[in-house]
Structure formats: C-alpha cells, structure tokens
Amino acid sequence: MAPKKKVAGLIKLQIVAGQANPAPPVGPALGQHGVNIMEFCKAYNAATESQRGTVIPVEITVYEDRSFTFALKTPPAAKLLLKAAGVAKGSAEPHKTKVAKVTWDQVREIAETKKTDLNANDIDAAAKIIAGTARSMGITVE
C-alpha cells in the first residue's frame, strides 16, 4: 500500500453548482494552499453539472504535494426551505413577521435529502432540525 499523503489543509466553500470559476471566493481560498485552481473548477463543475443553479457546499482536502480531493455535501437546509416555500429570502424579524408556510411533508422530504449531513439518528430528529431552521427564517411549519 502506498504511504498516506499528509493533509496540508481543509477548505470549506459553498459554490453554485456548475459555476465554479477562479474569481473570488474560489480563487483566493485555493490559491493560498497552492492548489491548481482551474483543475478544481473543471472537476467541481463536471461533478455538479446535474444540479445546476443550486448552491452545493464542498469540502476540499489539500495535501502537501498540492494535490486535492473534494467531497460534495447536500445543499444548505435554508436554501431547500426557501425553494419549498417559494420565497426569495427569509424574514428580517423571524419571530414577529412570518414570510411563508411549509407542510410537515415538505420538511420530512428536505430531511430525507439532508440526512447524510445532519447529526440525527432518524428522520424524525432530522425533520425537527429542519423545522428549527425554518422557524429561525420566519417560515411557519404546519
């Protein structure tokens, strides 16, 4: 077995799927670790081609020899909730002004999508996490 590569850094970014380019925030974040920026952009865009337009968080592991690997995460719960509710943004005063309503079924569906990234043991616990996010955005869960 080949010797393990030493990890030089871990970079977490949220980039719109299929639209990674060397401009900020991608370029500077990768540049300071010495990663080939264009190589990452091409690989990321190819991997996220099917989800164009959605924000996809990515965790990039940079090794000492300047090579890298990346893991794609599920879209942020807030973005999924906004899409489900059909609104552009959450409430400025979430506990005073409510901007939209989502059903428990929609919340469970989002929890199913996010379950790999959530720190929950079952779907009910994951749904409660998503419902909490909705509440803090001024979205009512019914």
From Swiss-Prot:
What Pfam families does this protein's entry cite? Ribosomal_L11 (PF00298), Ribosomal_L11_N (PF03946)
Tell me which domain of life the UniProt entry assigns to the organism this sequence originates from.
Bacteria
Instruction: For this UniProt record, give its keywords in alphabetical order, as a comma-separated list.
Output: Methylation, Ribonucleoprotein, Ribosomal protein, RNA-binding, rRNA-binding
Q: What InterPro entries would the database entry show?
A: Ribosomal_uL11, Ribosomal_uL11_bac-typ, Ribosomal_uL11_C, Ribosomal_uL11_C_sf, Ribosomal_uL11_CS, Ribosomal_uL11_N, Ribosomal_uL11_N_sf
Q: Which Gene3D superfamilies match?
A: Ribosomal protein L11, C-terminal domain (1.10.10.250), Ribosomal protein L11/L12, N-terminal domain (3.30.1550.10)
- What is known about its processing and modification? One or more lysine residues are methylated.
Record GO biological process:
translation
Keyword RNA-binding set for record: yes
Does Zinc-finger show up as a keyword for this record? Answer: no
Q: Which GO terms describe its cellular component?
A: cytosolic large ribosomal subunit
Q: One GO molecular-function annotation for this sequence?
A: large ribosomal subunit rRNA binding
The cysteines joined by S-S bonds are none
Q: What is this protein's function per UniProt?
A: Forms part of the ribosomal stalk which helps the ribosome interact with GTP-bound translation factors.
The subunit field of the Swiss-Prot or TrEMBL record says: Part of the ribosomal stalk of the 50S ribosomal subunit. Interacts with L10 and the large rRNA to form the base of the stalk. L10 forms an elongated spine to which L12 dimers bind in a sequential fashion forming a multimeric L10(L12)X complex.
Q: Which family does it belong to?
A: Belongs to the universal ribosomal protein uL11 family.
Which NCBIfam families does the entry mention?
L11_bact (TIGR01632)
Q: What is this protein called?
A: Large ribosomal subunit protein uL11
The organism of origin for this protein: Mycobacterium marinum (strain ATCC BAA-535 / M)
